[in-house]
Design a protein with these regions (language model features):
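Short linear elements at protein peripheries
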Residues: 133-143
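The catalytic Tyr-X3-Lys active-site helix of short-chain dehydrogenase/reductase
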Residues: 32-40, 44
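Active-site "substrate specificity/gating" loop of NAD(P)-dependent dehydrogenases
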Residues: 3, 28-32
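Residue(s) in the substrate-gating loop at a strand-loop-helix junction
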Residues: 24
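A short helix-coil junction within the Rossmann-fold of NAD(P)-dependent oxidoreductases
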Residues: 6-15
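A short, exposed helix-loop element centered on a Lys and neighboring polar residues
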Residues: 4-5, 46
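SDR active-site lid
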Residues: 49-114, 123, 127
Length: 143
């Protein structure tokens, strides 16, 4: 938050710039602290984008899905356990994020499969989302 606000202040004075905060398609799910933090990042980014509207500074929250990075070496789930269709490469995520930033989007969700998941996460009843994601993650994503 402090980095984004400091950067925003300097960029606003210059009249241009972009801030990209990394959220996750896991925001809004029952994945505990991780999901809560990623939801906060998304809401913060939306609020900051609104504050900076018309200043020449763009703000975007990137909500990638499963991306083949070092993240999976720190949790019990392995990247190989994720269906191939749901795995994203870092290069693809960056390309999609930059395209969305160029289009002025405030939220970027790379990949159709994750766009659908994100839509359902926020439109389905909270109790259903929490129960379903809690069930799926019961023995996974433990540090």
């Amino acid at each position: 938050m402090l980095l984004s606000q400091t950067a925003a202040s300097r960029m606003r004075r210059r009249g241009r710039g972009a801030i990209l905060n990394v959220s996750s398609v896991a925001s809004g799910t029952a994945m505990g602290t991780y999901a809560a933090h990623k939801t906060w990042v998304e809401i913060f980014s939306c609020a900051l984008a609104e504050e900076l509207r018309g200043s020449g500074v763009q703000v975007m929250a990137l909500k990638p899905g499963t991306t083949d990075t070092g993240f999976f070496s720190k949790i019990t789930t392995k990247i190989e356990d994720v269906p191939t269709i749901a795995r994203l490469t870092p290069e693809y995520v960056v390309e999609q994020a930059l395209n969305d930033l160029a289009r002025g989007k405030v939220i970027s969700v790379p990949s159709v499969i994750y766009k659908v998941m994100d839509f359902l996460t926020w439109k389905a009843p909270r109790s259903l989302v929490c129960r379903f994601t809690g069930y799926l993650q019961r023995d996974r994503f433990r540090v």
